[in-house]
């Protein structure tokens, strides 16, 4: 959204005959949600953090207000009425500040649930960013002479309690009957709280629900990059290629290690409704992007994507009693459920269970509970590297992958693959993360189809 001029020419107005009859679910401008909440990667505090910790949240919010004004000024050349845009967002910010002040007073009383009120404050702050960008987008298109509609799902000024689906249905009623282009806020207010379950993935959830509500022929996500065979920053831009076609199972595998084509809980409604998802590079408009469907299987056996993460650790649980005991795994799962934690992969033998977990989920209290239950509990920082595809069931492919890493001097700590054969996961030392991806991509993606694989 921060490169709106290019998005406008490459996407919204690219085909003059197909401007209308489209709904764009928009996110906030780059960096805005980080300022309102906290930085997604570095966790640098934002307005919400200041509010939750009793800090100077009013000053932090005023700083964001100035950032909104800067963004508005940068869009003047696109036709945005900067004065009207400043007034719109300033009124929102002032309104939010008033709500936060009232909430702070309630929290100080000690008579209310801190968790519930902080959750509401987080949602309130998040909503501003999408309302700002959607409003601006509609106004710019109107200035260019198009019939454009701003659809605000934030529930601003609406005291009626509605579920997310109810609010979407109400807001979109009759939209398909009008000759216009609509810009919809990525945040949607609902009684269930969209951020309580999806947190920063909420805009894609709204996108998915909107697509299902209007029975879209196709849902298209416009990103700053292609869904490619690997991260070009690691492999090199001249070596990776767009995936072009895959299925929702592969998309789920990618999301499991943090390479999200779409939030997994947002993908599911599209998959169940039979709506194809297309991931396009907004800055490469001539390319069709990658089409994700429910039943696609590549006609040739090949690895479609090499990816992974170095932000995981092995939780190793060793106990000599496991070999003769039923239920060790069950007891571990009970602890994970209590701490709202899921694992990425698991390996077992007679007396050891290894779980690969996100580093952020390895809470000291959870580890302490497990230490009281088993002889030895270790946390080992590692990385996971995956070779993923809709059709990788080919004799010798696992040998080819492990051979490539052996040639690169990489020791494989663990291997995981299910009978569906869509994802080979390799656990390696964290320092081998980049080297392992390069080795796998060179061997499995740069050498052509797996039909060339031969067992020697």
Name the predicted role of every residue range.
Residues 1-262, 267, 427-429, 448, ...:
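Nucleotide/pyrophosphate-binding catalytic subdomain
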Residues 218-222, 277-279, 345:
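Short hydrophobic alpha-helical runs that function as membrane-insertion/retention elements
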């Amino acid at each position: 959204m921060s490169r709106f001029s290019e998005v406008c020419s490459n996407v919204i107005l690219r085909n003059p005959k197909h401007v209308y009859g489209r709904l764009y679910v928009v996110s906030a401008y780059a960096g805005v949600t980080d300022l309102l909440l906290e930085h997604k990667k570095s966790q640098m505090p934002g307005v919400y953090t200041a509010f939750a910790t009793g800090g100077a949240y009013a000053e932090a919010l005023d700083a964001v207000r100035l950032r909104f004004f800067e963004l508005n000024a940068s869009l003047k050349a696109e036709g945005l009425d900067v004065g009207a845009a400043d007034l719109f967002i300033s009124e929102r910010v002032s309104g939010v500040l008033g709500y936060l002040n009232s909430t702070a007073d309630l929290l100080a009383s000690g008579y209310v649930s801190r968790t519930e009120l902080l959750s509401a404050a987080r949602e309130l702050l998040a909503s501003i960013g999408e309302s700002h960008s959607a409003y601006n987008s509609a106004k710019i298109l109107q200035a260019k002479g198009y019939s454009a509609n701003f659809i605000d799902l934030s529930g601003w000024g609406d005291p009626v309690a509605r579920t997310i689906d109810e609010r979407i249905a109400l807001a979109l009623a009759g939209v398909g009957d009008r000759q216009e282009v609509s810009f919809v806020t990525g945040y949607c207010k609902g009684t269930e709280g969209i951020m309580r379950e999806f947190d920063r993935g909420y805009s894609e959830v709204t996108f998915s629900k909107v697509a299902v509500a209007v029975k879209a022929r196709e849902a298209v996500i416009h990103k700053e990059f292609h869904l490619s065979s690997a991260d070009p920053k690691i492999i090199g831009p001249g070596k990776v290629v767009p995936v072009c076609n895959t299925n929702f199972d592969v998309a789920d595998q990618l999301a499991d290690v943090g390479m999200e084509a779409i939030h997994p809980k947002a993908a599911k409604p599209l998959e169940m409704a039979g709506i194809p998802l297309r991931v396009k590079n907004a800055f490469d408009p001539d390319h069709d992007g990658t089409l994700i469907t429910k039943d696609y299987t590549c006609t040739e056996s090949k690895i479609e994507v090499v990816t992974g993460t170095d932000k995981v650790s092995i939780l190793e649980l060793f106990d000599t009693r496991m070999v003769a005991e039923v239920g060790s795994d069950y007891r571990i799962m009970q602890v994970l459920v209590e701490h709202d934690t899921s694992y990425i992969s698991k390996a077992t033998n007679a007396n050891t269970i290894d779980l690969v977990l996100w580093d952020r989920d390895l809470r000291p209290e959870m580890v302490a509970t497990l230490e009281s239950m088993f002889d030895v509990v270790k946390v080992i920082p590692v990385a996971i590297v995956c070779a993923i595809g809709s059709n990788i069931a080919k004799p010798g492919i696992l040998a080819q992958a492990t051979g490539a890493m052996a040639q690169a001097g990489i020791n494989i700590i663990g291997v995981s693959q299910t009978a569906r054969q869509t994802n080979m996961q390799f656990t390696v030392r964290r320092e081998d993360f980049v080297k392992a991806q390069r080795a796998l991509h060179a061997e499995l993606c740069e050498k052509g189809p797996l039909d060339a694989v031969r067992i020697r």
